[in-house]
């Protein structure tokens, strides 16, 4: 196992250790034990920067199921390293922050188990080269985020937000699964790098469009793009460390990673470019507009996160244009990839810090309601300083890093509008227009975020707590991120050669080696647009109280949340009514529906699909086999007319023993012995329970009722016969029995084929079947024990009386 594999599974291994630490070290905050895990991973990832800077990659394989093409393959290039550094670096700061945020009275064992589970899953997503393994980790991120969002499960809003996020992201995960399967069909491989190398085969495949649509749905749901963004605001019910980690730097970036990783395969399609770009721009505009009307600090940050993700998504779409050009023209459009990567880093820094400051304000005052907040400038000066730095970066104000990436974004929109790629050239001018409008509202909500908390009148009578500056543990992590905001803004070269260029080269087919960011480029369209953004933004802030009321009057039926909630209520109710219409408490009626459907399906298939019934290879029927079958049928027939339960038990046993004899005739002594033992044990159990069973009652059933039963029973028997004959006479594949005959000894080192199949080739089936029996036995034992306990308690009460 390589160090890269260890880095991925280290958080998952530590999940198993946390319960022990939580059990024996309750006096020490559990976060101190967890903190070294992301720090170690981050340091290891830093050592790999030289590898990716030189244009090399790391490929490590761990065999899992090689016969099925599913191995634990890890591939690290510039893009994977970037995300790994974000996951582990921001993860370290979040764990440190959580030590000050979460009290030791909280269920810290659960919290850190969920957090490390998510961390390991995210590392698996960004480093997996096998798409099936990527999908497994992808779904694990959805599952672990569900657990984190619902951490305060006593709150109904937390449960609602967790369920909502799970439903939408799992829907996207299923779409992703369909897409990667369609990708694997033309390439006959699950390797992402192999698919990229053979992208032309995928592009010529009839499944290309369907795979592209399904993968885009998977990415859009994960990264909260329009119209799937509705889960992210409700996910803000999670503890603030979760929001700072999942919803600023990691989980919501998984969709962006998927789009970036799949760009070399799908960039040849103009549909990919248009869809990714427009969805990103629409998300940017819609979310930034909605962020301005939020009354909750986390609500503002939630919609701002959606907005910023839309900006990055749009840049990834514009960058895909570079695949349609060569030379310098290609590099012009590939600059959009560079801008996307840079803003992805910047967003993680300023948004992570803003989430942490929001948690600090909530921790200090007991509320996040902007109507109750204000005037905290002198009370929380350190928090104010951090907020100003990071919020201005989000607004795109120099000299912070957000200004550089926002300028790069505007440049890419103007560049895209001039591309001769699209059939309708005028639509290209929508790109800079939407980008500018979205940036105006971004400027507004960023400045208002500062004003809501620190300016205005201080209202202590409306605050649940007396406001105070929070502890150093809660300030250290956002302070580090705020410092990075300044450093990356003033010295972007720190990132360009080491992180941004290798990551961009991983997406683009052209090597990017001349990335530069400057505060001032001259009077370019992007710079002039920035001035327009500042002017319009200030005007909107001055008139904020007038126009925001119009947004807050938006009819509920025009929101996606309304239709989601309506569907969430209507679908279960309709399903329940439909189920109750045919499912009853009478098992006989339920069996009639099930068996009737089987009979109908069998006969429809018989009369609609051509088939052959071949009797050439059928073995001859011997007289003693006929005698046993007659005995078996007679015993089964007599059960219908039995008047005592004991007679029923004897006849059922006769049927079982007759089957055992047939197994002997068919040269399967192991099956015969097994059947004989099972029948003997079941008969003995029946007889032991016989004494406790009530008397057998006979009911006078109507003739039509009996006729229906007879028709259903006869139809099922006939269906089974027909299915058996069709299966025997229409073998489209070679029998698997030959495989067992050839490999029973070589692979399993056994001579008894039946035993080897049960305990080796199908060992997992046998294991789970045994587990089910064991669980059922424990359940019966528990119910009997509880019943005896209640009887004993009842007797004691009577004696006491």
Curated annotation (Swiss-Prot):
Keyword Chloroplast listed: no
Chief localization: membrane
GO CC terms in record: plasma membrane
Cell membrane is among the record's keywords: yes
GO biological process: proton transmembrane transport; sodium ion transport
InterPro entries noted in UniProt: CPA3_Na-H_Antiporter_A, MrpA/MnhA1/PhaAB, MrpA_C/MbhD, MrpA_C/MbhE, ND/Mrp_TM, Proton_antipo_N
Keywords attached to this entry: Antiport, Cell membrane, Hydrogen ion transport, Ion transport, Membrane, Sodium, Sodium transport, Transmembrane, Transmembrane helix, Transport
Membrane topology note: Multi-pass membrane protein
Ranges that cross the membrane: 1-21, 28-48, 79-99, 117-137, 166-186, 206-226, 265-285, 300-320, 337-357, 373-393, 427-447, 472-492, 522-542, 591-611, 623-643, 646-666, 671-691, 707-727, 764-784
The protein's assembly and partners: May form a heterooligomeric complex that consists of seven subunits: mnhA1, mnhB1, mnhC1, mnhD1, mnhE1, mnhF1 and mnhG1.
Function: Mnh complex is a Na(+)/H(+) antiporter involved in Na(+) excretion.
Family: Belongs to the CPA3 antiporters (TC 2.A.63) subunit A family.
UniProt-recorded name of the protein: Na(+)/H(+) antiporter subunit A1
Organism annotation: Staphylococcus aureus (strain bovine RF122 / ET3-1)
Gene responsible for this protein: mnhA1
């Amino acid at each position: 196992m390589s160090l890269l594999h260890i880095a991925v599974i280290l958080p998952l291994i530590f999940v198993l250790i946390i319960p022990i630490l939580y059990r024996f070290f309750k006096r020490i905050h559990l976060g101190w034990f967890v903190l070294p895990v992301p720090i170690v991973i981050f340091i290891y990832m830093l050592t790999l920067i030289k590898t990716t800077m030189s244009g090399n990659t790391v490929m490590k394989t761990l065999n899992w199921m090689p016969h099925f093409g599913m191995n634990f393959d890890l591939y690290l290039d510039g893009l994977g390293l970037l995300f790994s550094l974000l996951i582990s670096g921001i993860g370290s700061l979040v764990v440190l922050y959580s030590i000050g945020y979460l009290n030791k009275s909280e269920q810290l064992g659960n919290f850190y188990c969920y957090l490390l589970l998510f961390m390991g899953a995210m590392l698996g997503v960004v480093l997996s080269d096998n798409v099936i393994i990527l999908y497994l980790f992808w779904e694990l991120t959805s599952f672990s985020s569900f657990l984190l969002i619902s951490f305060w499960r006593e709150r109904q809003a937390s449960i609602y937000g967790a369920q909502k996020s799970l439903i939408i992201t799992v829907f996207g995960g299923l779409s992703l699964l369909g897409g990667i399967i369609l990708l694997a069909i033309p390439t006959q491989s699950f390797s992402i790098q192999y698919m990229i190398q053979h992208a032309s085969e995928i592009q010529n495949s009839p499944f290309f469009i369907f795979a592209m649509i399904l993968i885009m749905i998977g990415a859009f749901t994960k990264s909260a793009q329009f119209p799937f963004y509705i889960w992210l605001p409700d996910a803000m019910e999670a503890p603030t460390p979760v929001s700072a980690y999942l919803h600023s730097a990691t989980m919501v970036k998984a969709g962006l990673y998927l789009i970036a990783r799949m760009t070399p395969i799908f960039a040849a399609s103009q549909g990919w470019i248009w869809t990714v770009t427009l969805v990103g721009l629409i998300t940017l505009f819609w979310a930034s507009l909605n962020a301005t009307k939020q009354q909750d600090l986390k609500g503002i940050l939630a919609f701002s996160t959606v907005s910023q993700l839309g900006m990055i998504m749009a840049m990834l779409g514009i960058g895909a244009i570079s695949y349609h050009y060569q030379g310098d023209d290609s590099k012009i459009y590939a600059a959009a990839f560079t801008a996307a990567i840079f803003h992805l880093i910047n967003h993680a820094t300023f948004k992570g810090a803003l989430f942490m400051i929001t948690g600090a304000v909530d921790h200090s005052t007991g509320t996040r309601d902007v109507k109750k907040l204000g005037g905290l400038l002198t009370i929380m000066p350190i928090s104010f300083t951090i907020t100003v730095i990071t919020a201005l970066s989000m607004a795109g104000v120099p000299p912070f890093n957000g200004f550089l990436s926002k300028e790069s974004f505007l440049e890419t929109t103007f560049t895209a509008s001039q591309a001769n790629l699209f059939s309708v050239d005028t639509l290209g001018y929508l790109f800079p227009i939407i980008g500018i409008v979205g940036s105006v509202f971004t400027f507004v909500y960023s400045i208002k975020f500062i004003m809501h908390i620190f300016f205005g009148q201080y209202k202590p009578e409306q605050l649940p707590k007396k406001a105070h500056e929070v502890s150093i543990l809660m300030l250290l992590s956002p302070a580090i991120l705020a410092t990075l905001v300044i450093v990356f803004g003033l010295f972007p070269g720190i990132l360009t050669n080491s992180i941004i260029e290798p990551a961009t080269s991983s997406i683009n087919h052209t090597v990017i080696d001349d990335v530069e960011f400057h505060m001032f480029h001259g009077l370019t369209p992007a710079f002039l647009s920035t001035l327009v953004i500042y002017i319009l933004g200030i005007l909107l802030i001055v008139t904020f109280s007038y126009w925001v009321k119009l947004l807050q009057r938006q009819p509920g039926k025009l929101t996606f949340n309304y239709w989601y909630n309506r569907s969430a209520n209507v679908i279960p109710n309709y399903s329940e009514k439909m189920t109750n219409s045919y499912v009853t408490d009478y098992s006989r009626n339920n069996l009639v529906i099930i068996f009737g459907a089987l009979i109908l399906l069998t006969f429809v298939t018989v009369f609609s699909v051509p088939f052959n019934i071949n009797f050439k290879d059928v073995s001859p029927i011997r007289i003693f086999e006929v005698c046993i079958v007659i005995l078996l049928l007679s015993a089964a027939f007599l059960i219908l007319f039995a008047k005592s339960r004991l007679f029923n038990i004897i006849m059922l046993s006769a049927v079982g023993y007759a089957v055992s004899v047939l197994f002997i005739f068919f040269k399967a002594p192991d099956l015969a012995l097994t059947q004989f033992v099972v029948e003997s044990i079941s008969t003995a159990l029946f007889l032991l329970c016989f004494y406790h069973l009530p008397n057998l009652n006979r009911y006078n059933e109507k003739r039509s009722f009996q006729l229906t039963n007879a028709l259903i029973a006869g139809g099922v028997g006939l269906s089974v016969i027909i299915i058996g004959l069709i299966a025997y006479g229409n073998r489209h594949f070679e029998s698997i029995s030959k495989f067992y005959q050839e490999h029973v000894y070589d692979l399993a080192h056994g001579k008894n084929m039946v035993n080897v199949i049960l305990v080796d080739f199908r060992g997992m089936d046998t294991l789970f079947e045994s587990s089910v029996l064991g669980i059922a036995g424990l359940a019966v034992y528990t119910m009997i024990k509880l019943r005896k306990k209640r009887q004993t308690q009842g007797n004691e009460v009577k004696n006491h009386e």
